[in-house]
């Protein structure tokens, strides 16, 4: 059962850096719905993309799976035999709950839920990889290597879904969308104190990039095609495609 997010409703004397600990995991479904505009749409559309891209006898990777929302959406839309989903996250609290969520919904496609570092896992025989609001928590210097590894592990014709919070090269646009996002959180019941305290905890661990930076990295990794397929304010999702004739 998900609880309402009130983690930052009272003043916190010493704000540390953000961690996906037990307290966050307990309220995460409510937190992300009230904080990330378009999150439900992204999750459901990931399932539609899976229906199009997942091939028989291949694997799907959900890197930074949190509670397994994207994994479940993918699994509901796999209609082939001999597929497997590998869901990985480095938060013990998230993984514990993810396993419970996955086990609560029976389906033919098996899911391996792994507590580990996405930088260490091998990507093999993949028809689809999901990075759903995960890359932004890696050090910027480590992001290209992960995308390179994903590209190498994708089969020809495979797809990467990359969802992120964005920064903007146009400062005026960035300011507008930043303020619209805060309006969104206020409309969902967050106070100014809650918004401010959470932002202070996240600012050193969640480092955002522009869409242009993401596309440049994807191109450098080898992806022949990439495009923004969803955006709401400063949140969105790209899809990157490996050519069907890629070596």
Curated annotation (Swiss-Prot):
<feature type="binding site">
    <location>
        <position position="199"/>
    </location>
    <ligand>
        <name>S-adenosyl-L-methionine</name>
    </ligand>
</feature>
<feature type="binding site">
    <location>
        <position position="39"/>
    </location>
    <ligand>
        <name>S-adenosyl-L-methionine</name>
    </ligand>
</feature>
<feature type="binding site">
    <location>
        <begin position="64"/>
        <end position="66"/>
    </location>
    <ligand>
        <name>S-adenosyl-L-methionine</name>
    </ligand>
</feature>
<keyword id="KW-0949">S-adenosyl-L-methionine</keyword>
<comment type="function">
    <text>Catalyzes the conversion of S-adenosyl-L-methionine (SAM) to carboxy-S-adenosyl-L-methionine (Cx-SAM).</text>
</comment>
<comment type="similarity">
    <text>Belongs to the class I-like SAM-binding methyltransferase superfamily. Cx-SAM synthase family.</text>
</comment>
<dbReference type="InterPro" id="IPR029063">
    <property type="entry name" value="SAM-dependent_MTases_sf"/>
</dbReference>
<dbReference type="GO" id="GO:0002098">
    <property type="term" value="P:tRNA wobble uridine modification"/>
</dbReference>
<dbReference type="Pfam" id="PF13649">
    <property type="entry name" value="Methyltransf_25"/>
</dbReference>
<feature type="binding site">
    <location>
        <begin position="89"/>
        <end position="90"/>
    </location>
    <ligand>
        <name>S-adenosyl-L-methionine</name>
    </ligand>
</feature>
<comment type="subunit">
    <text>Homodimer.</text>
</comment>
<feature type="binding site">
    <location>
        <position position="132"/>
    </location>
    <ligand>
        <name>S-adenosyl-L-methionine</name>
    </ligand>
</feature>
<dbReference type="GO" id="GO:0016743">
    <property type="term" value="F:carboxyl- or carbamoyltransferase activity"/>
</dbReference>
<protein>
    <recommendedName>
        <fullName>Carboxy-S-adenosyl-L-methionine synthase</fullName>
        <ecNumber>2.1.3.-</ecNumber>
    </recommendedName>
</protein>
<dbReference type="GO" id="GO:1904047">
    <property type="term" value="F:S-adenosyl-L-methionine binding"/>
</dbReference>
<dbReference type="InterPro" id="IPR005271">
    <property type="entry name" value="CmoA"/>
</dbReference>
<dbReference type="InterPro" id="IPR041698">
    <property type="entry name" value="Methyltransf_25"/>
</dbReference>
<keyword id="KW-0808">Transferase</keyword>
<feature type="binding site">
    <location>
        <begin position="117"/>
        <end position="118"/>
    </location>
    <ligand>
        <name>S-adenosyl-L-methionine</name>
    </ligand>
</feature>
């Amino acid at each position: 059962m998900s609880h309402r997010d009130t983690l930052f409703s009272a003043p916190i004397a010493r704000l540390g850096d953000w961690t996906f600990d037990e307290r966050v995991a307990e309220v995460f479904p409510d937190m992300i719905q009230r904080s990330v505009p378009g999150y439900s749409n992204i999750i459901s559309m990931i399932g539609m993309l899976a229906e199009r891209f997942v091939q028989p006898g291949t694997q799907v990777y959900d890197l930074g799976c949190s509670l397994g929302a994207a994994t479940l959406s993918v699994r509901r839309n796999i209609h082939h035999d001999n597929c497997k989903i590998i869901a990985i996250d480095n938060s013990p609290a998230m993984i514990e709950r993810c396993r419970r969520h996955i086990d609560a919904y029976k389906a033919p496609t098996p899911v391996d839920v792994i507590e580990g570092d996405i930088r260490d896992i091998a990507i093999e025989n993949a028809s689809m990889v999901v990075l759903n609001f995960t890359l932004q928590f890696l050090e910027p210097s480590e992001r290209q290597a992960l995308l390179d590894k994903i590209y190498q592990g994708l089969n020809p014709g495979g797809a990467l879904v990359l969802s992120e919070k964005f920064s903007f090269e146009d400062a005026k646009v960035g300011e507008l969308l930043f303020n619209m996002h805060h309006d969104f959180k206020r409309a969902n019941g967050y106070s100014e104190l809650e918004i401010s305290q959470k932002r202070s905890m996240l600012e050193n661990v969640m480092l955002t990039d522009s869409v242009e930076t993401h596309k440049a990295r994807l191109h450098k990794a080898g992806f022949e095609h990439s495009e923004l397929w969803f955006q709401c304010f400063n949140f969105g999702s790209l899809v990157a495609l490996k050519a069907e004739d890629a070596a």
